[in-house]
């Protein structure tokens, strides 16, 4: 019997299904409840066909069971509305939405539609374990980082850690994301006939994850997001212009110093073969992030690359990683598996 009990609220969506998949093989956590308003009493496998062997039915979110950890896989606005019920049911709440990622109420006024529980913002711990794992043990509310923000922050973090960037430089972030980012509900733009074959700018400016990136790097960024023809993945290409000259040796040192002890980060910079730089296809289905860089001395530019599976490192995998740390479990538990290769068309 696993040592900790878990419930998944909003379990019929893509992120909820991914959390269920991870917990189904977790050595220390067992799912005792999965909720869905739309599919109450239906088997989990009837909605998530990859989980047909899971002996669990969806229950009502109005009847939450007492558990050690609750994963809230709900749309923006739901967790802040129901956080009291979530906390009554669980010692630790891991929220996969944006409801508790930002620090202050004014940020929600600017980037979202306000916040109705601002008194809880300073009690929630942002979860990108490579950034702040020391804040997670014993946390009551864990706000799992967003997929686009995670991709960008993972790539840029070593440049700040290594004092290559100080905060006043120009930073341009271009992220390309898969269709699963739109969720199971999707929409016209996410349907196969509309999505197939596209490289579509959908947030040239003003993407909400820009606030998340700026908050945790402490500097402004110019952020653009494109929808592309893949199901899973987020690929960030970041263009930065350091004020002082930078060598490849400086970059290698900075990235190794930041990530050499990180269990879910791989440094991929040049080399030979097809996969010479980070690519979402190489991490599909896993909690790994690949990061890399290239130097453009002619234009005094550093190009940084980061690739994640938006459903894993950008969502469910990161949430389970954070929950492991919050509960005092070995942080890699249930996540130490490679991605899928080859991966076919979306």
From Swiss-Prot:
Subcellular location: Cytoplasm
Annotated catalytic residues: 147
Top-level taxonomy: Archaea, Methanobacteriati, Methanobacteriota, Stenosarchaea group, Halobacteria
Function in brief: Involved in both the arginine and lysine biosynthetic pathways.
Family: Belongs to the NAGSA dehydrogenase family. Type 1 subfamily. LysY sub-subfamily.
Gene: lysY
Transmembrane segments: none
Enzyme Commission identifier(s): 1.2.1.103, 1.2.1.106
Annotated positions binding NADP(+): 12-15, 310
Residues spanning the signal sequence: none
NCBIfam families: argC
Pathway(s) of this molecule: Amino-acid biosynthesis; L-lysine biosynthesis via AAA pathway; L-lysine from L-alpha-aminoadipate (Thermus route): step 3/5; Amino-acid biosynthesis; L-arginine biosynthesis
Cellular component aspect of the GO annotation: cytoplasm
Top-level taxon of origin: Archaea
Catalytic activity: [amino-group carrier protein]-C-terminal-N-(1-carboxy-5-oxopentan-1-yl)-L-glutamine + phosphate + NADP(+) = [amino-group carrier protein]-C-terminal-N-(1-carboxy-5-phosphooxy-5-oxopentan-1-yl)-L-glutamine + NADPH + H(+); [amino-group carrier protein]-C-terminal-gamma-(L-glutamyl-5-semialdehyde)-L-glutamate + phosphate + NADP(+) = [amino-group carrier protein]-C-terminal-gamma-(5-phospho-L-glutamyl)-L-glutamate + NADPH + H(+)
SMART domains for the chain: Semialdhyde_dh
Statement: the UniProt record of this protein carries the keyword Oxidoreductase: yes
Alphabetically ordered keywords of this record: Amino-acid biosynthesis, Arginine biosynthesis, Cytoplasm, Lysine biosynthesis, NADP, Oxidoreductase
Name of this protein: Putative [LysW]-L-2-aminoadipate/[LysW]-L-glutamate phosphate reductase
Main localization of the protein described in the UniProt heading: cytoplasm
Any single GO BP term: arginine biosynthetic process via ornithine
Alphabetized GO MF terms: N-acetyl-gamma-aminoadipyl-phosphate reductase activity; N-acetyl-gamma-glutamyl-phosphate reductase activity; NAD binding; NADP+ binding
InterPro entries associated with the record: AGPR_type-1 (IPR000706), LysY (IPR037535), NAD(P)-bd_dom_sf (IPR036291), NAGSA_dehydrogenase (IPR050085), Semialdehyde_DH_NAD-bd (IPR000534)
